[in-house]
Amino acid sequence: MPRVASVAAVLAALLPSALGQANTSYVDYNHEANPDLFPQCVATIELSFPDCENGPLSKTLVCDKSARPHDRAAALVSMFTLEELVNNTGNTGTGVPRLGLPKYQVWSESLHGVYRANWASEGDYSWATSFPQPILTMAALNRTLIHQIGDILSTQARAFSNVGRYGLDTYAPNINSFRHPVWGRGQETPGEDAYYLASTYAYEYITGIQGGVDPETLKLVATAKHYAGYDIENWDGHSRLGNDMQITQQDLSEYYTPQFLVSARDAKVHSVMCSYNAVNGVPSCSNSFFLQTLLRETFGFVEDGYVSGDCGAVYNAFNPHEYAANESSASADSIRAGTDIDCGTSYQYHFTNAFDEGEISRQDIERGVIRLYTNLVRLGYFDGNSSQYRDLTWSDVQTTDAWNISHEAAVEGTVLLKNDGTLPLADSIRSVALIGPWANATTQMQGNYYGPAPYLTSPLAALEASDLDVHYAFGTNISSTTTAGFADALAAARKADAIIFAGGIDNTIEGEALDRMNITWPGNQLDLINQLSALGKPLVVLQMGGGQVDSSALKHNTNVSALLWGGYPGQSGGTALLDIIRGVRAPAGRLVTTQYPAGYATQFPAIDMGLRPNGTNPGQTYMWYTGTPVYEFGHGLFYTTFEAKRASTATNHSSFNIEDLLTAPHPGYAYPQLRPFLNFTAHITNTGRTTSDYTAMLFANTTAGPAPHPNKWLVGFDRLGALEPGASQTMTFPITIDNVARTDELGNRVLYPGRYELALNNERSVVLRFTLTGEKAVLMKWPLEKQEIPPAA
């Protein structure tokens, strides 16, 4: 992350004289993926609220609670001078002191906990709950859990904002899809599936954060990011700031934008962030096709929703993209294309010049600022203590309920990849050797984008608090090639009844601005695991980190008893992992990414955005991959056995006419394709001896429509809680018309006649077949890609 300047430096930088100065120092952003930003961009500031009782604004329309939010905001902005207007177009706005309008910081974060807050050094407001990274939370396959986390995050954020320590909007969630396994920021995402996983995560997180679906009073403004085609940091020297991603309209519609469609159309997100990269030659923040044609006209983005550029992305349209001739033109292009707020300083530095040159009008500038302040009106920013969430305090942050949810997410997301019966550990195991670079992890468990947590329970701390004897040895580092710690590790292992190795990857080799060049276990961790396995004792390996590594060697080593994937588990990570290992809880998570063999990472360039297989590309994601994975997308074992039987109300081999489906009444659904037309119902019985949750993924497949055909695609998931031995429950998946549509070469969503299958999990334990008849039908027409940046208004 960029360095954060002091508040004093920010205030000095925000003087109007400073904002009129241009940046003339250019960095080669084609190779530098994470340069420092200007101090006024990255600073945290003390939030304060306008005084609508006795302040200068008290008699103006913006303080009239009975007026429409847009009208209140427009009345406020109409009072700004041009200089004042320009000064409030960046993420760090100066406010308007003469009107009693405080400065405001748009840039706050809440990926998996409150972040970029004005933290107290100790005591109240010095920490917030740290949840697992989204990729682990998504592996739990629990919608309710995602929504709860969003709700808790916004409650804690509002408590911080009420005392001036946080803003009222947040740059989260990250809903890009984890397309290629080397991507450093995949840990921040819900996994590799765009259509169902990322879209569901987006919906639940956004509605949790914002306080519902477009509520009258917003709780917090969520920002769906990064729009669009952003999933490479610095792979092989390709900087995220200068990447020009070549994406077909088919892939753009099918894979890179459906989660943004759901965010805008269904969840009613109030902010979207355009990304650093270009797509098909046009930088995202200067892309009118993305920001107007798709987002507003096709996806139905809320009228007063605002688009924020990623931090520095407006400037990047000039350097390194060279799409604009200079920074002033880059700013003019971006505001007219639809980027309302610049997370950066380009707008503030260059709008006055662009206005003088006739490149933009006051109306162009006002549009984005009005949208921002309309949202602040809906957040209660101008409503004083009567605002719905102004009574939230520190007592709403320090709740054990939030801590319990964090622990639950870590438990539910943990995935059992391999087990020979060693797990859960038998009661006869009284001593354990804990070895490896994750064994004593604390902040390591938080991944990236994290703030101070109330506590961080490492695996070592959790074990030492148990009734087991613990023999700890570091063994080796994440990327170490020295064997200096091997002897101590082996000595500790010889003293113990069982061995736990905690390793994998972490933010030293994956993260923002940091991609991997391979997907092998780094350093000499596998060498140490192999030597430990030769001791012939029960050996449990914890594979940690967001991205997958090729664990073929562990899968096939019969002396490796069990393998768990634990992601970045957050503040309760050690306790959660120990609960799984000892059988206090049973694992039921499923992989939300494919674990590929190591050769996949070098088989084709990671910047190849094509999903479908071709002569050099074996296909990307579980939908299109033609090879054999180490562990499949959706893989996950249990401590018990389950039997799944079809109990569907729809008869197998049913037939549906396409025209009838689309012309049938659809009350409660804005679009006919969102109406369920059949239910897939499975009867699940715990046939084993251990109480366990049960998770399932439902996949569709067909040979209808044009080739190539996907292997399958996800149309549902669910989680049943705590099935006791012998107990049964049913899980029902409503199947919508859109669920079984495909995307044609033009990007249209099309329903094709033909035979279809719905299958439960990779094992296909329950299968339902049906046929669609009649003529194919376009469900959503993808617009023609063209750039039409309007002239200055």
UniProtKB/Swiss-Prot annotation:
It catalyses: Hydrolysis of (1->4)-beta-D-xylans, to remove successive D-xylose residues from the non-reducing termini. Glycans are attached at residues 23, 87, 142, 326, 385, 404, 440, 477, 518, 559, 614, 652, 679, 701. Its EC number is 3.2.1.37. One of its GO terms (cellular component) is extracellular region. It comes from the Eukaryota. It holds the Pfam family Glyco_hydro_3. It is an enzyme of class 3 (hydrolase). Keywords: Carbohydrate metabolism, Glycoprotein, Glycosidase, Hydrolase, Polysaccharide degradation, Secreted, Signal, Xylan degradation. Pathway: Glycan degradation; xylan degradation. Its main location: secreted. The active site is at residue 310. It is found in: Secreted. Residues 1-20 form the signal peptide. GO terms for molecular function: alpha-L-arabinofuranosidase activity; xylan 1,4-beta-xylosidase activity. Xylan 1,4-beta-xylosidase involved in the hydrolysis of xylan, a major structural heterogeneous polysaccharide found in plant biomass representing the second most abundant polysaccharide in the biosphere, after cellulose. This is Probable exo-1,4-beta-xylosidase xlnD. It comes from Aspergillus terreus (strain NIH 2624 / FGSC A1156).
